[in-house]
């Protein structure tokens, strides 16, 4: 990881990922309830494709008017586009190529803002932590997982979709076992929600004890001068 030069970032920046329906949102909500700032990639992804943005215009040119609801301000029809990209790897690649640079840049701006305000550490909540290469500049990574059958059942219930659609969306992402191998912290969510919350609280307690974020404050001036240069090169590559 090219940010390993600045080892305090190992604990200052925490990457949170998981499967499509493994409980990542619940984990994120526990962090937020404990006052930890969250940079939510899904939320940012919605911001960068609002009508009128350059990313929106590129998507409309790439996928056509049928994926946009002109009766409601021209907003992106996410469900319809989702069905396309989860069944078509080439279209998924095209979507990612258009949206990911804009998402990375917006997340980085939020990251710098939070650093300036003096937060202890930050959580990047992103389902594509490893697929998008975000783990290259995030030291501490957390993956929340559950068994495949549980994930399918949760998706069918939550999203009101067929089992086939649920399985297709799960298989479109990196295998959860591979994510677990790459993660520094793995949270098992095969139990109930109260058990999950207790596990997250334990992780938060571990992070709170870290001394690295405080060292980062001393090195912040140097980092602020160097990191944007390399990160800008990365997101534009």
UniProtKB/Swiss-Prot annotation:
Domain of life: Eukaryota
Family matches, as Pfam families: CoaE (PF01121)
Recorded GO MF terms: ATP binding; dephospho-CoA kinase activity
One Gene Ontology term from the biological process aspect of the record: coenzyme A biosynthetic process
Record key words, sorted: ATP-binding, Nucleotide-binding
Secretion signal span: none
Family matches, as Gene3D superfamilies: P-loop containing nucleotide triphosphate hydrolases
Record: residues binding ATP: 18-25
Family to which the UniProt record says this protein belongs: Belongs to the CoaE family.
Protein name: Uncharacterized protein T05G5.5
